Amino acid sequence: MALQWIVIVSLLISSAIGGGRDNMGTEFILGFMENKISGTANNIELFVTTTSNTPADITVTTPLFDPSFSETTTVSRGNIKKLELTYNIRGSGTAVENKGVRIVSTQEITVYGVNKERYSTDGFVAFPVDAIGLEYVLATWKSEAVFMIIGTEDGTTVQITLSSSNPTATSITYNGATYSNGQTLSVSLNKYQTFHAFSSSGDFTGTKLVSNKVITVMTGNRKVAVKDSMTRSSSDHLVEQVPPIDTLGKDFFTISTPDRNIGDYFRIIATEDSTEISLAGSVYTTINQYEYTELNVVTGDYKSITSNKPVMVTMFGKTISTQSGDGPNGGDPQFSILPAVPQFPSDYTFSTIQTPTGDFNNYLVVVIKDSAKNDLKLDEQSPSGVTWTPVSGSSHNLVVATFEVNPGSHSVYNTKPSATFLGMAFGNAQTNSYSYAAGTRLAPINGPCTPSSTVAGDIVDNDCDGWIDEEESNGIDDDGDGSIDEDLANLPRINGNWAAWGQWSACSLTCNSGTGSRSRSRTCTDPAPANNGIDCVGSGAETGSCTVNTPCPIDGQWGSWSAWNCSRTCGNGLNTRNRECDNPAPQHNGADCSGNSTESGACWAGTCYPSVLGNLDKNCTSSSFGCKAGNIDCVDLEKSCDGAVDCTDGSDEDPQVAGCTPACSGAGVNDGKHTLFVSLSAISVIFRNWRLLL
């Protein structure tokens, strides 16, 4: 099956409680078998997804392989992450190698492996370490058969017994010895070691594996054509991970590859002697342990397959034929191991992944009880426009329908968790096909059973009747076994829904200064997701713009300083200047200006001269005398030259300043005798200074 599209199928089932097993887990140890390379080799691909509402942190390593490989990634619900490993990690020939691949995760995940080469591709759903076992039986087609065993613990010993009844059984040459039909070889493995076996012309169907410690087992064909008289020669890689024998069952049915009319092969392999096989309610044949019977079933022939002892049922899609109308969209062989009816879950999700060369025509085949088909949801919608066909001979009143689905992710589940169903994914394109079970429970329904108390959705056969989680918590005997609510399915799936938005927060603005922001939140609580329900889609928070009408405070700012102003017109004084808080003035409760509104300092305004004699600056009035210095500025003019010192510096009696006549006794007492002289002297000084001004 060369890949153009590969469907990656994720099982969405209830969390395993109390030891339940399914194809979801937190640790996987896998291997990849030999493929036929044509041209440039392609890397191995791993796809991982989760049904947890908490993102899963995933690490992939090749612990023993050289060169070693390690990569980490995170995947959230509803998404798929792809990781690539070198094609050299594939097994080759018949040998023990160090090619185990380990995957660990912080949450339960579903893992898919894709072994892809040009025109030779297949994929498989991986089983976690807690769901694998000790005993297996193999199924392959008739040539280029391969199988691989991967050790999960040190000191593992596996006894491999080749089929003694397979008409096309093969031989194995290992460590210089050749083993053929009915013979047993022993292989020793440590953790992460692999044993790979290849036969170019034989068939390993019916080969038995028994191990002392749990092992992972892969089976299929390197590249093979699944032919009948009408088919062509196109071939493909086939691979499946093998379920342990203790998970096999007794209740199956046939289905058909969509978009084909050439029919399909089914092989039924017994795990115990005297196994009676019935088709559509009638005995068909009896086979012994590790024998198989093969059915060539025409397209559209849906019928039950039942047995009195556990069997493994495999489906081989045929190579495209020359028959008119067969494979209008192409097709190649494909290989699936069908789950037994008790292992069906009630909730799946699957997604298609495109390769560069084009699209598959993608299909989902559903088999469900007729009474439950109307409770089915595909992408949250009730299916319509499909034809439901009964399964002949089914005691469960099963019906089959095929849904064509677009590329992308899809979810299909039943609103009643006790109503389980089969989901098989198919795809056809030119020289390409794929098919495998969308998911499976892996409960040990074929092993010893001890009755236990039920926990809803625990994936455990609590009442040891070979069925799992078949009752609803309703006080009714749903399965008709005389007991009530003894093996409970999970409660109905509840998808999360957003509650109303909370109040908006305060605007980031406190005043009208532009556009601000605000936020609000909501919770996924109306209802909250429960019972494997999907979390709310979208964000629990949002922001929006906002404005405020309140004017913003305006803080005051100082205006310019005024000119300096001396407090005295002459002599020593106090120099001051001031400024106003008006550039701008504070508004709307804005802060006042900080600092002082005035500044001061000492100043000298110049010599205080007489206003009449020598005082051209007119610092004193015309009736005053300006002292030259000292603390007194001006005195009455009549006190100058009166023989009494009035200015502290004596300048009012100084002939050079006041113009007093030196000849006058008593320093020029102003007694009337000197008045005219003084006046004339003063006039003389005035005129002298006036001439200087001119």
Predicted regions and their residues:
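N-terminal signal peptide
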Residues: S10-M24, F687-L694
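Sec-dependent N-terminal signal peptides of Gram-negative exported proteins
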Residues: I8-V9, I13, D642, L680-I686
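Intrinsically disordered, low-complexity linker/terminal regions across diverse proteins
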Residues: A2-L3, S14-T454, C464, G480
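Extracellular calcium-associated, cysteine-rich motifs in secreted modular proteins
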Residues: C449-I494, N631-K639, G643-G659
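Sec-dependent signal peptide recognition
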Residues: A2-V9, H674-S679
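Thrombospondin type-1
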Residues: P492-I632, L637, D649-C664
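Cleavable C-terminal sorting propeptides in eukaryotic secreted/cell-surface proteins
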Residues: V669-L694
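Short cysteine/histidine-rich zinc-coordinating motifs and their immediately flanking basic loops
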Residues: C524, C581-D582, S640, V645-D646, ...
